[in-house]
Amino acid sequence: MNKFTQHTGIPVPLDAANVDTDAIIPKQFLQKVTRTGFGKHLFHDWRFLDDEGTQPNPSFILNQPIYQDASILLARENFGCGSSREHAPWALTDYGFHAVIAPSFADIFYGNSFNNQLLPIKLSDEQVTQLFNWVTEHAGTPITVDLVAQQVIAGELCFSFEIDAFRRHCMIEGLDSIGLTLQHQAEISAYEAKQPAFMR
């Protein structure tokens, strides 16, 4: 995985609570098991007026020209609730999002996000509301999420966030479960060398 230390990008304010995984990536688009190709279906039922995805809904926030290059998603509480599909963070990252900021996340979505190098940032309701107000007033203006300093910076606003030290380390170093295992390759090889031939 790519290393994540800091990201500066345009935030898009999705002013909705309890956004579930079926809204993030509807079930009819889950046939693939690879991680790519889901971005075009992100928020399909909200982004499009037709089933084929050829008629954009002009009232949906992601379809507004100023947010076309958004890479940070701002949402309300309980983001990613519903089923445990890992396709949800796949769709978000494939679309181009690097971070999601919300007061709270569904537990499984929260864990899946770290596994897919999508940074879920928890801020208080008050801080999220301040960010919504700032983003609305400064639409299209980039903000910064700094994983090393554990801060979200938007103009004069600067909010600190907490994150599990192990997950933070893995994202900063770009380590998934395979990468973590390979860090111990020497120990693994030494252990294997001690085993009887029939066990190798």
From Swiss-Prot:
Top-level taxon of the source organism: Bacteria
The entry's family comment says: Belongs to the LeuD family. LeuD type 1 subfamily.
The Gene Ontology CC terms held by the record are: 3-isopropylmalate dehydratase complex
HAMAP family reported for this sequence: LeuD_type1
Q: What is the lineage of its organism?
A: Bacteria, Pseudomonadati, Pseudomonadota, Gammaproteobacteria, Enterobacterales
Q: Which molecular function term from Gene Ontology is one that the record holds? A: 3-isopropylmalate dehydratase activity
- What does the protein in this record do? Catalyzes the isomerization between 2-isopropylmalate and 3-isopropylmalate, via the formation of 2-isopropylmaleate.
Which gene does this sequence derive from?
leuD
User: What is the protein's quaternary organization?
Assistant: Heterodimer of LeuC and LeuD.
Origin organism is Proteus mirabilis (strain HI4320)
Record's NCBIfam families?
leuD (TIGR00171), PRK01641.1 (NF002458)
This enzyme's EC code(s): 4.2.1.33
This chain belongs to the protein called 3-isopropylmalate dehydratase small subunit
Q: Name one Pfam family in it.
A: Aconitase_C
Q: Which InterPro entries match?
A: 3-IsopropMal_deHydase_ssu, Aconitase/3IPM_dehydase_swvl, AconitaseA/IPMdHydase_ssu_swvl, IPMI_Swivel, LeuD
